[in-house]
């Protein structure tokens, strides 16, 4: 989706009468609505499928971009370097993702009424998002992981009780066994199909049964598929104010993913220096150039020996960025991605 950076308007040209002229021009929202863009928007949302991947796979840049983004049209600054990472995360994992968002830029463009950018697919599934305080977001996301694990454990226990019962219908047992066979690999297309069959069988069985175990399974049926927990925030949160929480969460070894949107300054409050700011960089509170080194949080995280650590810059290498996100999601343990993001606070014209 467009980030409003304006590069296409500045750089894309066409030959008009032997002279190069802009191929695109800026237009106001009111003018585009008057020209019929509302109808076009209905076509894109209501008629087109959620993904048009064809033979492309989600593990490629091209394939992933042919999926519906479940984060779109944010109110971030023009050309924001953070939003492409959030959009990629929602595009890859959005149907099952739970996001704990630290206060900062990403909480402003991510959850400020009325421009809430998180959306859902045609099945009504999309990211679950919540914003905590600046100083406890890592712990907040860790709590989400613990809650998911507890709900999945309870669901498994209730399903096993039903499967052990002589009174449960055979078709219900077959459907539940099918869903449980994908318990440890629950996000594949085959697993999702089995889970949907189980949900349908549960709903059918409930029509003629008041079994408390079955009611509980129905309440928890969304947890047949494990949730993807992402803890998101900026470098001011990760390197400074919330670092203690991140360190504690990484040390627990649980399956959480941390995305650090690293602009190397406190972007939301005007571009002040953080511990992520490189040596000699000029920023607010470091007008003469920052005298100390950038905190090497990646090495600090690697010292645990069981944390997946990646450093990415989408503008430098899209394939490596994709690979890092997919590997972090696939790793059954704590992962942290440091995502370099250009920012308007850098003052680059």
What are these regions (language model features)?
Residues 1-32, 56, 60, 84, ...:
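Iron-sulfur cluster-binding cysteine motifs and their immediate structural context
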Residues 1-4, 24-34, 61-74, 217-218, ...:
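Ferredoxin-like iron-sulfur electron-transfer modules
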Residues 9-11, 21-24, 95-100, 105-108, ...:
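Beta-sheet entry/capping signal
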Residues 12, 63-66, 71-103, 107-114:
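N-terminal amphipathic, basic-rich helices that act as targeting or association modules
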Residues 12, 48-62, 209-223, 265-267, ...:
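Structured alpha-helical segments in the cores of large, soluble enzyme domains
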Residues 37-56, 117-128, 273-295:
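Acidic, Ser/Thr-rich peripheral helices and adjacent loops at domain boundaries
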Residues 134-212:
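N-terminal leader/propeptide and maturation segments of large enzyme subunits in energy/redox metabolism
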Residues 225-231, 240-255, 261-349:
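Glycine-rich ThDP/TPP pyrophosphate-binding loop and its adjacent helix/strand module
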